[in-house]
Regions:
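Short alpha-helical patches at coil-to-helix transitions and adjacent helical residues
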Residues: 34-39, 116-120
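Catalytic loop of the DD-peptidase/beta-lactamase superfamily, centered on the K-T-G motif
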Residues: 17, 47-60, 64, 82, ...
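Active-site-proximal loop and beta-strand segments within enzyme catalytic domains
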Residues: 1-36, 43-44, 50-56, 60, ...
C-alpha cells in the first residue's frame, strides 16, 4: 500500500491511523511481505516509549556514538549541505534529473540521508558484532536476533548459473543469504533518484555500502557483489555481464509485443456522463483524497505528490487510463473506474492500487456550496409526510438541520440549487421544491426511493 504514504502531506500519526483501513493480501505470518508501514509503526512505538521524536532517538543512540555528524532526516535539510547529491532516472537512452521526494511522514521507513563514509561506520559496527572500538553500540542479545532467520522470504534455491548464491530469509530488518559460502546480511532500498544497499559479513568482519544517485538502479547489487568477490578473495563472477545479458533478453522478449492496454480496450464506447460530472473529491480512509479537476475538457488527477501533468485519458465506458509524466508509451497504465448510484450520479471511483487485492473504492465527497443564513431561512419550517411532522431548522450561524421524530438530528450540506446532502447518511439527499419563489415541499431521495413531504 505504498501509494497511501508516498508523497502524502500528512502527519506521522495520520499515516498510522490509515493502516486499519488497508486490506491485507495475506493473513498474519502466512507469507513474508515487505511493508513500509511496519517500519513506521516501529518508529512511532519508540517515540511513545521514550517520549522523544524518532529523529532525536536515532541521533542520541546511533549517530552520536558513531560520530555521524552530517547525516540528516529530510531532503529539506539535505539541500542545505554544501555537496548534496542530485538524483537521476533513466528512460530509454536518456538520463534526466528527478526532483527530491519528501518522505518525512514515513521517516522511519527510510528518510535518512547520509554519505557513504558515514554509512560505512554503521556497516562496520554490524560487521564487528555491534561494537565500535570495543564499546557495545548494539546490545548483543538484539544483535543475534537481528541477524537470525525468522521467516523465509522465498525458496532461495541454488540456480544453475550461480549455485553458490542461495537461501533467502529475513531477520529483524535484515535480509539473510549465503553468498559463495559466506553468511551475508543485507538491506537495500530505493527512493526517487537514489538507490542504496548496506551489507556485511559477520563471520568475515567485512561491511560494504553502495550508494547510487540513479532511480531503481541495479548497479548497487552489481557493485556490492564485485567488491565482495575481491575483498573476500572469491572466484570473480562477471555480475555486470549477467545483468546486461538479462536486460538484453528482456528487451528482446518485449520487442514487437503489443501494449496490453490496446488489447483489452473496448472500442467505440463513450463515458456515461459529461466531463463535469466526474470532477470532485474522492475519499478513502486508508488512502486519503483523490481530486479530479477539469482542465480544458481534460480530466486531471491530483493525489499526494502527483499534482502536475497527471491526466485521465478515456479508455472505455467509465474507465480512464492514468497518464503520468515521462511515462513510456509501451508501459501499461493504471486504470480508474468511475461508479454511479441508482440515481445515475457519479458517486465513487475505484483504482487497482495493489495487483493482488480488490480495487480501492473512493467515495465522492459532497462539495459544499456557500449559502447565507438568509437563503437557508426560506427552507425552515414544518413538513408533513404520512401524518409525520418533520422539522427543518438552522443550527448556529448557517447550518441547516432536519429532525425526523425518533431519529437523531441530521446536518445538511448544500450541494446544489435547493439541494442538500445528509452529512452522515451516504446516498440520502433532500431537494426543496419551490413555486413562485416559495418553498412548498421537499423530496427525500433515499436508496429505496423518493418521498415527498409538503410544507405546512
Amino acid at each position: 500500500h505504498d501509494l497511501s504514504w508516498y508523497g502524502a502531506e500528512v502527519s506521522r500519526d495520520s499515516l498510522l491511523r490509515r493502516i486499519k483501513y488497508l486490506q491485507p493480501s495475506a493473513g498474519l505470518r502466512e507469507v513474508y511481505q515487505y511493508n513500509n508501514f511496519m517500519f513506521l509503526v516501529q518508529g512511532i512505538l519508540a517515540e511513545k516509549i521514550e517520549g522523544k521524536p524518532w529523529e532525536v532517538l536515532v541521533k542520541e543512540k546511533i549517530f552520536n556514538p558513531l560520530g555521524i555528524t552530517n547525516a540528516n532526516f529530510s531532503v529539506n535539510d539535505l539541500q542545505k549541505a554544501p555537496d548534496f547529491s542530485l538524483g537521476y532516472a533513466k528512460m530509454k537512452d536518456s538520463i534526466f534529473r528527478l526532483p527530491y521526494m519528501n518522505i518525512d511522514p514515513i521517516g522511519p521507513a527510510g528518510s535518512i540521508n547520509a554519505s557513504a563514509a558515514e554509512m560505512a561506520k554503521w556497516a562496520m559496527v554490524w560487521a564487528n558484532g555491534g561494537k565500535l572500538n570495543g564499546k557495545e553500540i548494539i546490545p548483543a542479545s538484539f544483535y543475534n536476533k537481528a541477524i537470525t532467520s525468522h521467516m523465509a522470504v522465498n525458496a532461495g534455491l541454488p540456480g544453475k548459473q550461480n549455485p553458490d548464491v542461495h537461501l533467502s530469509t529475513i531477520g529483524l530488518g535484515w535480509f539473510l543469504s549465503s553468498y559463495k559460502g559466506h553468511y551475508r546480511v543485507e538491506h537495500g532500498g530505493n527512493i526517487d533518484g537514489f538507490s542504496a544497499t548496506v551489507s556485511f559479513f559477520p563471520s568475515d568482519t567485512v561491511g560494504i555500502v553502495v550508494l547510487v544517485n540513479q532511480n531503481g538502479s541495479s548497479a548497487t547489487s552489481i557493485i556490492r557483489n564485485m567488491i565482495t568477490d575481491r575483498v573476500l578473495k572469491l572466484h570473480r563472477t562477471d555480475w555486470n555481464k549477467i545483468q546486461l545479458d538479462a536486460i538484453k533478453e528482456a528487451e528482446k522478449n518485449s520487442a514487437g509485443v503489443t501494449n496490453p492496454d490496446s488489447l483489452g480496450r473496448k472500442t467505440g464506447t463513450q463515458p456515461s456522463h459529461p466531463i463535469a460530472d466526474y470532477v470532485g473529491e474522492y475519499f478513502h480512509p486508508g488512502y486519503g483524497v483523490i481530486k479530479i479537476e477539469n482542465i480544458r475538457d481534460t480530466l486531471r488527477l491530483i493525489y499526494n505528490s502527483f499534482r502536475e501533468n497527471v491526466y485521465l485519458t478515456h479508455y472505455h465506458y467509465d474507465v480512464f487510463s492514468v497518464t503520468l509524466p515521462d511515462q513510456e508509451e509501451s508501459t501499461q497504465k493504471m486504470k480508474v473506474q468511475f461508479l454511479m448510484n441508482t440515481r445515475g450520479e457519479i458517486d465513487a471511483m475505484s483504482a487497482q492500487f495493489e495487483a493482488a487485492l480488490d480495487p480501492v473504492k473512493f467515495e465522492k465527497r459532497s462539495v459544499e456550496k456557500p449559502v447565507t443564513k438568509q437563503e437557508l431561512e426560506r427552507y425552515t419550517g414544518e413538513y408533513e409526510i404520512s401524518g409525520i411532522t418533520i422539522k427543518v431548522y438552522i443550527k448556529g450561524e448557517n447550518t441547516l438541520m432536519v429532525l425526523v421524530p425518533g431519529q437523531p438530528d441530521y446536518e445538511l450540506i448544500p450541494v446544489g440549487e435547493h439541494e442538500f446532502d445528509f452529512k452522515t447518511l451516504k446516498g440520502f439527499k433532500l431537494k426543496f421544491v419551490l413555486e413562485k419563489d416559495k418553498v412548498t415541499s421537499m423530496d427525500f431521495h433515499q436508496p429505496n426511493g423518493v418521498f415527498k413531504a409538503n410544507k405546512k
